[in-house]
C-alpha cells in the first residue's frame, strides 16, 4: 500500500506489534497506526479505496479483513501515538520489511490504555527484558505517564 501510494506510511502496533518483542500470545486482529489529515472533521480511512479495489471489502468487528486478519487502521492522533508512528523501526519478516512500533512506545501505550490485558503484557515486556528501562522512562515522562508508571511499579514490581 505504501509502495503504491495508497497510504503515506504505517506502523504495526497493538498485540501483533508486541509479538515482535515478546513470546507470542493470542490476538484477534492487527492494529496499524496511520496518519490522517488533522484538519478534517470526518476522517477517511487512508487506503480504503485501495483495499476495496483489491477485493478487501469485508468488515469484521472494527477491522477490514485482509488475508484472513481483521486489520484496524488506527489514526495516530495523540502525541504518544504520533511519536510511536514516527519512530517505528523496520523489521524483516520472511524478507519483507515491516515497520513496527518500538517496544518502549508499545509499553507506554499499554500503560496509558490500562486494560487488564495491557497490564499483563507490560509484565511480559519487563520480565523478558524486551524494553530498555531508561528509554521507556523517557517516553513515559515525555508523555505525562509518570503517575501511571509509579502506580504500576508499586502494584506489580514488588
PLM feature spans:
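Compositionally biased terminal segments of proteins
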Residues: 1-158
Amino acid at each position: 500500500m505504501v509502495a503504491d501510494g495508497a497510504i503515506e506510511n504505517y506502523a504495526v502496533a497493538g498485540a501483533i506489534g508486541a509479538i515482535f518483542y515478546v513470546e507470542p500470545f493470542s490476538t484477534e486482529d492487527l492494529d496499524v497506526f496511520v496518519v490522517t489529515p488533522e484538519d478534517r472533521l470526518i476522517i477517511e480511512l487512508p487506503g480504503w479505496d485501495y483495499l476495496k479495489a483489491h477485493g478487501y471489502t469485508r468488515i469484521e468487528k472494527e477491522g477490514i479483513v485482509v488475508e484472513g486478519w481483521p486489520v484496524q487502521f488506527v489514526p495516530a492522533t495523540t502525541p504518544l501515538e504520533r511519536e510511536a508512528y514516527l519512530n517505528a523501526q523496520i523489521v524483516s519478516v520472511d524478507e519483507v520489511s515491516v515497520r513496527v512500533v518500538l517496544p518502549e512506545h508499545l509499553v507506554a501505550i499499554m500503560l496509558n490504555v490500562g486494560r487488564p490485558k495491557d497490564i499483563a503484557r507490560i509484565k511480559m515486556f519487563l520480565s523478558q527484558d524486551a524494553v530498555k528501562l531508561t528509554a521507556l522512562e523517557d517516553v513515559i515522562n515525555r508523555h505525562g505517564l509518570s503517575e501511571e508508571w509509579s502506580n504500576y511499579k508499586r502494584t506489580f514490581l514488588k
